[in-house]
Amino acid sequence: VLAVLVWNFGSYTPGAQMTLKTGLIVQGNSSLEVQANTDKSWKVYHDPAYSPSIEYLQDVGCSDILNASLYPWGWENLDYNDTDWIEVRTIGRGQPYGIGSGYDWILCKRDIPFMEESLLRMNRIRRAEGIDLPSDFLKGKAELKVPANQKVSLFIDQDFLTTAYPELIVSGGKNSLVKFTYSEAMFKDGEKANRNEIEGRDVIGFVDKFYPDGGSNRLFRPLWFRTYRYIKLDIETKDEPLVLHDLYGMYTGYPFKENASFDCDLDFMKQIWETGW
């Protein structure tokens, strides 16, 4: 099965994303790959589970609000029933760059590598409010159970600024709210100070919201990666307890390898080189 998630922030599209309108074009370059071409053999479903979170809106787009009760869980699996999905509609054709005029999409050969993705464990919890934490939770070796009708806050420190997709796997907790707030530093009275200090400070930044549906092993992952050092996780449960099975990041970025070298007798010059990595 070939399953694709297609998204567009619409009026909240960030400056870094050049887009005409929502669509998907796939072209296979061999007799076998041609099966993947975007023709009427494809089916589509408009997912109503997502809505834009515009708290702390910046020029990097909006954040996500995901209502798990509306999400088509298992859509990417071979045994998923897509009977209610509809046939795609052609809205335009792609053309090679420099050929023709009046086109909507231009197909260009990719000349840079794809972005990498790898597991990035979150480093430590600097502060926890409303719950006692198992010591191995962030290592993926222990679950965290939040009782019904409870409010909990976790202040997570990656210890360095990174770009990653935070991923949270939960079960139960129908109608709960899980809120992610991302920041490079903590704030006090609207001001940043030493990035290592947290006492009397709070996290201000991009906000994702996830509303679990009570199902098992539900995965929340934002549509686009987040940039953060700190994550504040606010959880409010209703009539059901919420089990957090795991919380981690999936680091992403373009490959960046140190192919050159530098050496000299001045230590401060060596430190400048090291800072770049």
What function would you assign to each model-found segment?
Residues 1-277:
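Extracellular/oxidizing-compartment recognition motifs
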